[in-house]
């Protein structure tokens, strides 16, 4: 597995934060690094496989990667990221207690992926721009200014994330997308889902298409297929059982959609025939 080292990304041996844009981010094999990372998805879509679990990411997704996490990107479509790299909690001169602003693992579950709305994403861009222009002065005021900007970013993300439960349409769509990640295998009635999240059906369709480039049903199908591909690679369940586990009522229909999406049949994936180009 590829290991990325801080010496290759941080401007100096003492700098606690670095900005690394990926415009766009191509598919990238599994790796980990000796630093922490906040991945901010500007736009586009892709699959983020995080510690072996696949997540669909799009504009507004924010992922918190720790120095012992492993991850990769695949099936990317104009996926543009800004990576905010930071060495460790004890690398800062003026900041303490950062863990209170970061996702925390509880009972083996780490809520690594948050979502923010488009207006917050614009504020994030402005803050990142200030961080990039903050210079590399080593005097106390310059160091403090850079650390303050990083703290402002964490506060903004924390306040604006799905966890804080905002009520505008962007936030409602974020909540809906997070719900789909957990309920993808269920029968989904879009009218009922729209009502559940206090959105009109028309707004749901329009906003999901703007965020992902896909209609709601195509987005759901892709989500199901991604989960199915993960099970094909990492479980012993039969193709038919995986189809049903991932919300498909007919295994033949599942196989047709799967081949159309990935250019491989479920059996090909099960037998590892795609590994050559991974």
From Swiss-Prot:
Q: What does this protein do?
A: Activates expression of the rhaBAD and rhaT operons.
**Where does this polypeptide localize?**
Cytoplasm
Against NCBIfam families, the record matches this protein to:
PRK13503.1
CDD domains the UniProt entry points to: cupin_RhaR_RhaS-like_N
Q: What is this protein called?
A: HTH-type transcriptional activator RhaS
Species assigned in the record: Salmonella agona (strain SL483)
For this protein's source organism, the top of the classification is:
Bacteria, Pseudomonadati, Pseudomonadota, Gammaproteobacteria, Enterobacterales
Q: Which GO terms describe its cellular component?
A: cytoplasm
Enumerate the Pfam families for this protein. Answer: AraC_binding, HTH_18
Q: Name one GO molecular function term.
A: DNA-binding transcription factor activity
Per the UniProt record, the site (Interaction with sigma-70) maps to: 241, 250
- PANTHER family referenced in this protein's UniProt entry, alphabetically: HTH-TYPE TRANSCRIPTIONAL ACTIVATOR RHAS (PTHR46796:SF13), HTH-TYPE TRANSCRIPTIONAL ACTIVATOR RHAS-RELATED (PTHR46796)
Q: Which UniProt keywords apply?
A: Activator, Cytoplasm, DNA-binding, Repeat, Rhamnose metabolism, Transcription, Transcription regulation
DNA-binding region(s) in UniProt? 191-212, 239-262
- Which cysteine pairs are covalently linked by disulfides here? none
């Amino acid at each position: 597995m590829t290991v990325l080292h801080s010496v290759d990304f941080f401007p100096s041996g003492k700098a606690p934060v670095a900005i690394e844009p990926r415009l766009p981010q191509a598919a990238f094999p599994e790796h980990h690094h000796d630093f922490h990372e906040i991945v901010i998805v500007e736009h586009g879509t892709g699959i983020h496989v995080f510690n072996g679990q696949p997540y669909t990411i799009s504009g507004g997704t924010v992922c918190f990667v720790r120095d012992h996490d492993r991850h990769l990107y695949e099936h990317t479509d104009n996926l543009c990221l800004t990576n905010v790299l930071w060495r460790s909690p004890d690398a800062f001169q003026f900041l303490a207690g950062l863990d209170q602003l970061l996702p925390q693992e509880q009972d083996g579950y780490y809520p690594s992926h948050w979502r923010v709305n488009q207006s917050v994403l614009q504020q994030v861009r402005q803050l990142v721009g200030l961080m990039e222009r903050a210079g590399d002065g080593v005097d106390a005021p310059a160091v403090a200014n850079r650390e303050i900007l990083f703290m402002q970013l964490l506060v903004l993300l924390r306040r604006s994330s799905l966890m804080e439960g905002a009520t505008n349409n962007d936030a409602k769509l974020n909540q809906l997308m997070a719900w789909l990640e957990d309920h993808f295998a269920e029968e989904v009635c879009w009218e009922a889902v729209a009502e559940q999240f206090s959105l009109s059906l028309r707004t749901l369709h329009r906003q999901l298409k703007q965020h992902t480039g896909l209609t709601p049903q195509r987005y759901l199908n892709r989500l199901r297929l991604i989960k199915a591909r993960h099970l094909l690679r990492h479980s012993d369940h039969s193709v038919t059982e995986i189809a049903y586990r991932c919300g498909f009522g007919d295994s033949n229909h599942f196989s047709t959609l799967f081949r159309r999406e990935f250019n491989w049949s479920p059996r090909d994936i099960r037998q590892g025939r795609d590994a050559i180009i991974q």
